[in-house]
């Protein structure tokens, strides 16, 4: 076990995007959207948008330790949510859209998810489960608006 720090900052998930935005701000982040379109951004923009999301979640009353889920594909929006949620100190709970409904209900309730970020094509999955989800306060759909 190493007793000394190898770097002058405490490593955590949010520090990864901070580092990337600082050292490689213009490096491209490319993702394919659900629509099939290719979206291009960069680490600096992902970091800025992740910070905005973190601030909004705190403003809405969510705090460190809360569990916030995502039901999404690997797009730039999911990446921003991942860094934004972890950046404000909440737990990111990634959900698998392939789960049987009973499994999904159990997992969401057991994790005590308070918010679920969801990709538009997966909204019907959550609509079917909604009345059985006891801890979810809010659903946020990833979209362009």
Stretches found by the model and what they are:
Residues 1-12:
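Flexible, non-catalytic linker and terminal segments flanking ANL/adenylate-forming cores
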Residues 3-5, 41, 68-69, 91, ...:
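Short, contiguous strand/loop micro-motifs
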Residues 10, 71, 116-119:
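Active-site-adjacent beta-strand anchor residues
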Residues 14, 18, 47, 51-54, ...:
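Generic alpha-helical structural signal
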Residues 16-18, 59-60, 87-145:
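Structural core segment of the AMP-binding/adenylate-forming
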Residues 16-41, 143:
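AMP-dependent adenylate-forming
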Residues 29-75, 79-83, 100-105:
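Conserved AMP-binding/adenylate-forming core of the ANL superfamily
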């Amino acid at each position: 076990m190493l007793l000394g720090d190898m770097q002058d900052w405490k490593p955590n998930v949010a520090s990864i995007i901070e580092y990337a935005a600082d050292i490689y701000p213009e490096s491209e982040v490319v993702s394919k959207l659900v629509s099939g379109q290719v979206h291009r951004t960069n680490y600096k923009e992902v970091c800025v948008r992740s910070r905005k999301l973190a601030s909004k979640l705190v403003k809405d009353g969510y705090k460190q330790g809360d569990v916030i889920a995502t039901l999404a594909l690997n797009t730039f929006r999911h990446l921003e949510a991942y860094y934004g949620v972890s950046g404000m100190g909440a737990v990111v709970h990634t959900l698998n859209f392939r789960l049987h409904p009973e499994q999904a209900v159990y997992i969401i309730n057991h994790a005590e998810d308070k918010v679920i970020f969801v990709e538009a094509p997966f909204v019907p999955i959550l609509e079917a489960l909604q009345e059985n989800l006891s801890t979810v306060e809010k659903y946020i759909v990833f979209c362009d608006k």
